[in-house]
Amino acid sequence: MDTAVVWFRDDLRVTDNPTLADAVAAAETVIPVYTFDPDRYTESEYGPPKTGGHRAVFRRQAVADLRASLRDRGGDLLVRSGRPATVVPELAQRAGADAVYAQTKPATEERRRAADVASALDDAGIALRQRWTHTLYHPDDLPTPPTDIDDTFTPWRKETEAAATVRDPRSAPETVPTPDGLTPGPVPTVESLGVSEPPTDDRAVLEFEGGESAGKRRVESYIWEGDHLREYKTTRNGLLGADYSSKFSPWLAAGCLSPRWLHREVERYEDERVANEDTYWLVFELAWRDFFQFQFEKYGATFFKPGGIRERNIDWDRDRALFERWADGETGVPFVDANMRELNRTGYMSNRGRQNVASFLAGVLGIDWRWGAAYFEARLIDYDVASNWGNWAYQAGVGNDSRDRYFDVRSQAERYDSDAEYITTWLPELAALPATIAHQPWQLSEAEQREYGVELGVDYPEPVVDIDARYQSL
């Protein structure tokens, strides 16, 4: 093969990237391209933009880092702005390419984009060769095909762990033979994408920087320098600080890190330092991530229906004003509000927080869970279609769980933030309150409000619902 185009999507790395590796192995010249698709920066059908400021910054950093890595190997990355179905086929035709190599993903919009590109390429007699690059287990290695897998995680995990193996990560190509004379193109600014620059906040748990280089530095810091993997399961439900959890998710979501490469790092750590339940638990969480990817392969667009894959007939509330109170962190329920304010200011929220705010929106307020999932899509720096929508459906009782479930945010706050350090970090207006009262300020008497200088409805909102009565009714 003379020329291949590599269309980068959510696989912004050179290490363990079968899309890039196969193109380099097959073609004499390789033209890598990334296109900033305007459809990813427009408003979703639920209102918020699909990509907010924090993720837009992370994405452009990741693209710039990928370009640097390719240039280190004698190649380059062409950066364009436009819909892939236009940009990629036009580039391939002008270059006289024999094939275009690209990542494949299971979600609906991602599939549609690939189909549109494939159709335009087919008209020009050019093949689209897709590679599965973003999970720990390859779908071809599963004991049961994704379309037939169990809808419950534990049976699927046990079957998969017993019968499947994780493929070895592939090395980065030593050279990428990109021809001379191409116009690389600038990496667009956040503003030119139609996105506002995100706020900065010194309370953020970590300064997330996009790119494979930064992702590997985070792995080095967390696993090797900090030696935190040995206590991962024990600390993973924390709320404050850089190292209570791995925080690898932004780099996994953008494809800056490969799950297989990360698995190899865990194995190396277990060989060189310690193997215990904590080290296994990171692989366990990667399996959870896989599970939702394969569930999307099975159910596709059904995940986006109000009743989810369980096709439940639930009359969801669509009170926009109430939803905005939740989104802005103004519900009057501190554990919910603190988490939402952290998300809005930093683009990140702990897993414990995500479960609680989702359960509160769908279970306590009864608001259409898809509004919450779309809001997370806009705000999260580590947004992944399958993980986000799969977890939201799970918490709303319409996904991969046959049980109706909810989190009691009162007891969750007391358990995971017993000293109220987290909520007072993000809700400083409650800092004068004793911890037990700070978690449930709606119980303050008028005299106590005067004593502590916290007036409900003025300094901090009254709760949007009678929280105690609502939990009694669930």
Swiss-Prot record:
Biological processes per GO annotation = photoreactive repair
Give the record's keywords alphabetically.
Chromophore, DNA-binding, FAD, Flavoprotein, Repressor, Transcription, Transcription regulation
Residues in Photolyase/cryptochrome alpha/beta domain copies: 2-136
Q: Which cofactor does it need?
A: FAD; (6R)-5,10-methylene-5,6,7,8-tetrahydrofolate
- Residue stretches of biased makeup (Basic and acidic residues): 161-171
Record-level Gene Ontology MF annotations: deoxyribodipyrimidine photo-lyase activity; DNA binding; FAD binding
Segments for region (Disordered)? 161-202
A Pfam family that the UniProt record links to this protein: DNA_photolyase
Instruction: Give the cofactor binding note.
Output: Binds 1 FAD per subunit. Binds 1 5,10-methenyltetrahydrofolate (MTHF) per subunit.
Task performed by this protein: May have a photoreceptor function. Binds DNA; probably functions as a transcriptional repressor.
Would you identify the family this protein belongs to, as annotated? Answer: Belongs to the DNA photolyase class-1 family.
- For this entry, the protein name equals Cryptochrome DASH
The species this protein belongs to is Natronomonas pharaonis (strain ATCC 35678 / DSM 2160 / CIP 103997 / JCM 8858 / NBRC 14720 / NCIMB 2260 / Gabara)
Q: Which gene encodes it?
A: cry
